[in-house]
Amino acid sequence: MGIMYLTRRSAMGLLAGAIPAARRAAAQPATGLEIQKGPFVGTRDSLKAYRVPEWFRDAKFGIWAHWGPQSAPEQGDWYARKMYIEGDPAYKWHQQHFGPQSKVGFKDVIPTFKGEKFDPEHLMDLYQKAGAKYFFSMGVHHDNFDMWNSRHTRWNAVNMGPKKDIVGLFRHAALKRGMKFGVSEHLWISYKWFGVSHDSDKTGPYAGVPYDGNDPQNFDLYHDLPKDYPAQFSWDDKGIPDSWKRHWFDRIKDLVDNYQPDILYTDGALPFEEYGLNLVAHLYNDSARRHGGKVEAVYTSKLKEDCAEGTCVLDFERGLADAIAPNPWQTDTCVGSWHYQRDIKYKSPKTVIDMLVDIVSRNGNLLLNFPLPGSGALDDRELAILAEITKWMAVNSEGIYATRPWKIFGEGPGTKVKGTGRFNENGRQDLTAEDVRFTTKGKTLYAFLMGWPAKEAVVAPLAAKGKLEVGKIRNVELLGHKGKLKWTQDEAGLKVEMPEEKPSDHAVTLKVALG
């Protein structure tokens, strides 16, 4: 069958329309979905009572490790799909290094995923030093390969590849350091995403020869698709049978039960309505069981409608909210490609730090992915970025952790660039000395100067008789600077004479004591 090629961005763009439309259709009740008893049942009305735990609001910064069999070729994200799309660079690379897809498919890539340099304890030390308060492990990507000791599929990291319980090892390392632990599931769409593996070349010496996804021996990896399955790939649950929905529920429930994540991330909207709602209720109820009746777990969805009235945390992939959101939210983004890609351009440390401050000022958290290569060891450029974040957080993290938004998130040219939700980060420029961002903690206001001022910093929103009614300022400090500052507050704003040496690269933080 001919399969249409969608990019990740265009596929995710279908979420806003397709999923709500599907949900308006009356769903038949799913039977036999056993969940932990507790305060929630698997309905939207019940889940409206959910409230985001304070630890998540305080944490602000998490690190994610996209890692799995697709990391082994080191050719970037969606390799297991793109390698079956004739003409795609991944298709060509696969033929050059493995052979024709009709003979050597993704199943044959999996044994090359060794993780021979994987050291979760060392990695977690680096992540913690960089200031991450929570860590995310890949649970299962669209490639249908579980990174834990799964009892629902032989295609898992304990049975093949590195032959280790990757989720379990990451969890142990994170919890030992007092970090919260999250897992991501991208499984729900795998049924459609892997449809290309059932195709064949249109041209060349193997034209018409079916790819290895057509072999019944491989259906437990590539899925047993009907011969008349729709050729067009769409990011929704149309055409996905109830048997797969139930399998998804059982498999992710197994992940939740055995690894008790503090955060569960779905790549997309909450899947399969009643199946998904019951899974979220199970996650929350099990958390309440383990925490004396208090729900400490978090579930994230990328669909605004899922999170409008409690239920879960809204996640923006490679984007951010336009303004201060009333409820906590999260940006998930990457220093480069989601899965490891050789020689790709990475975000600079300044870009990453700008994003963190900007996001926190709007009531959000940043989840930053450092993709691991197949070996399981970070590359030198990733280590350099982590080192810069570590240095910056050592000076400025007081203005990040456990803070809340102020009356406005900021001032300056960067505030005029709209957030607009998902996939907008490429249109944003690094912030400059003309930009300021704000956070608060009690009677302390933190003003982040996003670039180093020449001599004097002027923070206009902190004017003595301005519209924001700041009131009288009692004291001003510069985080990381031991000396006293000369400052005044008048109708033009807060004016601070800056020292000759800046206490940190990138953004610097004024600690303002309000009256």
Model-derived features: where do they sit?
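Bacterial Sec-dependent signal peptides at the C-terminal "C-region" and cleavage site
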Residues: 17-30
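Short alpha-helical segments used as structural interaction elements across diverse proteins
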Residues: 5-6, 20-21, 54-57
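N-terminal secretory signal peptides and thylakoid transit peptides that target proteins
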Residues: 2-17
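Mature catalytic domains of secreted/periplasmic carbohydrate-active enzymes
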Residues: 28-515
